[in-house]
Amino acid sequence: MKRTIAIVAGGDSSELVVSLRSAQGLYSFIDKERYNLYIVEMEGHRWEVVLPDGSKTPIDRNDFSFMENGEKKQFDFAYITINGTPGENGILQGYFDLLGIPYSSCNVLVSAMTFNKFTCNQYLKGFGIRVAESLILRKGFEITDEEVINKIGLPCFIKPNAGGSSFGVTKVKTKEDIQPAIEKAFEESDEVMIEAFMKGTEITCGCYKTSDKEVVFPITEVVSANEFFDYGAKYNGESQEITPARLPEDTAERVRLLTSAIYDILGCSGLIRIDYIITEGEKVNLLEINTTPGMTATSFIPQQVRAAGLDIKDVMTDIIENKF
C-alpha cells in the first residue's frame, strides 16, 4: 500500500515564495508510483492541502489529517521544505513529534540550533572548525558604529541571525551604512548577527546519511555577479554555479570530510547543505548550515545529485524510507 506524503511548504517569513517553488521541485522528484503526494501550504493559521484538481482543503491540526471526497486521510510522512519559521527552526518538528509523524529533516534541537547562525557557529568553533569573527545584537540593545569597527572591522556582513535566502543581509563597507543595515536585518529577525568579511571562494556541499549509507555530494562553487551571494544571485540567475567546484583535490576532500563530520557532530538527519568560504592558504571556513535546503529544479542539491550521477528519485526514496 502506498504511503501518503505531505510536502510541507510556505511558512511565516519572506522565504515563503522560495519554499513554494521547492515544493514544486519535490513534487517532481519524489516517486509518484511509490507514494501518494500532496502539497500542504502553510501561512500563519492557514494550513491547506492542494488536492489533485487544484482546489484546497483545510488541514485538521489536531492530527494533521484532511478530508478528500468525504473520506478522512492521514499522512504517513512529512517532507518539510519550509525555509524559515516554522519549518526550519524546530517548531514543526516538535508538532510532528507530538503526533508521531516521521519527517524529512533534523530533529527539534538540531533544527533550532542550526537556525540560530551565531549559536551554531560558536558551538562548532569549539570543535576546531573555522568560522568568521562575529557578534550578536538583540532587539532593545544598541551598538555604536565604533564598536562594530573595532570588534569586527569593515567591510562586514550584517544579517538576520535567523533566516535564509539572503533576506535582510547587507555587505557594509562604510561607517554610515552600519545602522541602516542593522535596522534592515531587524525587520527579518529579533536578533542580528554582525560578521567579519572573509575574502575567498564561496562553495556549498550537500550530504545525507541513512542507516546503511553516507552520501556526500560533489561541491558547488558559487561565483556571484553581485557583491555577495544575495537573493538575486540565488534565485534570479545572477551567479555562476560550477559543479564540481574548481578546487584542488586535497581541499575538496577536506570539505567533504568536514561536511560529514559536522553532520555527525550536530546529529543531523535527512538532507543538509553546508556553505563555506575558502580563504587564502586553502583555509576552509564555515558560513552556515541549511537543514531544509532549497529543492527547486535549479537548486544546489539537485545540481549536485546530477553531478554525482545519481537519480534524485532514489535520493528522495532514501530520505523517506530511512524514517520507517
Identify the residue ranges that each predicted region occupies.
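Active-site nucleotide/adenylate-binding loops and adjacent lid/helix of ATP-dependent enzymes
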Residues: 3-9, 13, 21, 113-201, ...
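Cysteine/selenocysteine-centered motifs that mediate thiol-based redox chemistry or coordinate metal-sulfur cofactors
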Residues: 315-324
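Phosphate-binding site of ATP-dependent enzymes
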Residues: 173-257, 278, 283-285
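Conserved metal-phosphate-binding beta-hairpin within the catalytic cores
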Residues: 196, 206-207, 263-295, 305
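ATP-binding N-terminal substructure of ATP-dependent carboxylate-amine bond-forming enzymes
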Residues: 1-109, 113-115, 119, 138-146
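Glycine-rich phosphate/pyrophosphate-binding beta-alpha loops
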Residues: 84, 222, 290-304
